[in-house]
Structures are given as structure tokens and as C-alpha cells.
């Protein structure tokens, strides 16, 4: 494991591990390969790029992480100059030696294009594992009951960049607050702080129902999404957003933040499911519209489940294989 001076305790607290380099193993693998694919942009990848170039192997990459994902853990997520500097470092030392780069979303494609990345940029989703929608075709008998609690969920790691506080603040502006029961599904470094924020709404009487805060297995998340009324996604830094995509597989209507470097909003089928990032009032308005239109919400959920079929991981794999074939045909840079 590679250790970063000064920052290693913070990295450990986030639960991350960075690979170290065994040059003999790396050289053996690269000599064997027809194409060398970079999954990240760290120390191991710099060594791999240098060796692949030396051995004349074509290089490709997937853009999986924004600099802001790292910098936000250091309290520097909003330092645009620092994040741009890191991204340019990645570009100059890794990505510009690639023939092709997989961009999981349009948002990523546009960012790399605007920063003059030289590679062939290709929008290819990371893909979803196909999953059966277990939400029934017709709503249950009590679905239109004006007294029943409305389940609004947020699935995601409890960290600064996921921005659960905007969701929590939005509840103070919601006309349905007394009927809403929120569920924060996940864990992470900000779990205690976000739990306190959510519980304060309950103690202050804003919420009638006590918030549910828990970590769930994949099977449990499927059931949670299938039984929920709405799913909120506030992330300000997001390459793609697997959690919201998996929720939509269960015919759950989302309300998703749109921001400069958050790519998940592309999955919204229309503007009713998009709000301005870090704007709790706008989020509350979008939530309230959907909660006030249960029949439209149910039918729209079916369309969301159908839309996720386009992101089947098998389709993404086929597109990536074609990308590799093109890279081999073009040769190394």
C-alpha cells in the first residue's frame, strides 16, 4: 500500500487504500497485455503509463473520480484553483498519453473537453447490474390515503460531497414535512453530524416521524427503494451516481441536484426531477410537486425503471471492448 506523507491519517479515516508499485509485476503484466487500461490516476498509474509507453503499448483510461472528491476530504473541495491544478497534473502525466478515455457521463465528457484533454473522449456508463423491479405494477390500496406517511429516502455515503444537509434543510420548507418520514441510507465520516441535523428536525417538531438512519445491504436497498415514495440525490461532486440509478431501477422517482461537476442529473427524464444544487427551497418545491401528484409519480416511476435498461452493464462492456479494439488498431501515443 502506498502511503501519502502528511495526509495518510485522513485517507485512513475515509477508508481508502492506494496501491504501491511492484515494477517487476507491472512490467510482466504490461508485456502480456495488448492494451493497458487506467482505472484511477494515482502513483501506480503514473508508473504504468511510463512503462506502457516504454514498451509501446496503447493506453486507455476510465475517468472515475474528480479532484474534488479527494480535496473535499481535506476541506479543499471548493478551492477551484487547487482542484484544477490536480486535474491538469492528471491530464499531463496520465490522460494525455491515452488514446481513449471512457467518460461515464456527459458532465465528465464536457469537463475534460473544456480542459483540452487530447484523447478520444467517449461517453460510456460504468453500467448497472440488471435487477428485477419488485415494485408492483399497480399502487397498493393505501397509496392515495392522505394520512399515510410518505417515505422519502437518500441513499449514499455520508460525506461532504454527497450534501445530505441540503435535503435535511429542505424539509423545513416542505408543505408535506408532517407526513414525510426520511431515511438516510449509508454510512461515512459525517454520519454523526448528519444524524444530529436530522434528529433536530424531529425534536423541533418539523417532522412527525422519527428519521431512520441505517446502513443497508444491496437486497435491503432494493426493498427500501421499491417501497419509497421519492428518492433525493444532492451530491455536488459526482461522476455518475450508482446509488440513484439502482433506486430508479425500482421505479422510484428521483429529485437530483444539477451542478457544475455533478453528473447524475442526466438521468432525470425532465426538469421536475432536477433542482439547483445546494438550494433547499428549490429542492422542497420539487419534492412537494411530486408528493402532491401521487398518480403521476407512480406512472413516472415506471418510465424511470424502463430508462435504466439503457445502462445495462453488458451494453457498457460491449462499448468498452470496441474502445479497446480501436486503441489497439491506433497503437500507442
Where are these regions (language model features)?
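Acidic anion/phosphate-binding donor-loop and adjacent secondary structure
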Residues: 128-148
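Aromatic "clamp/platform" in nucleotide-sugar-dependent glycosyltransferases that forms part
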Residues: 41, 236
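Membrane-proximal helix-turn-helix segments that form the acceptor-binding/catalytic region
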Residues: 54, 66, 82-100, 115
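Conserved acidic donor-binding segment of nucleotide-sugar-dependent glycosyltransferases
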Residues: 269-280, 289-294
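Carbohydrate-associated surface elements
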Residues: 107, 127
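A conserved mid-protein helix/loop that constitutes part of the nucleotide-sugar donor-binding site
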Residues: 150-173, 189-192, 281
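Short alpha-helical donor nucleotide-sugar binding micro-motif in glycosyltransferases
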Residues: 30, 216, 222-228
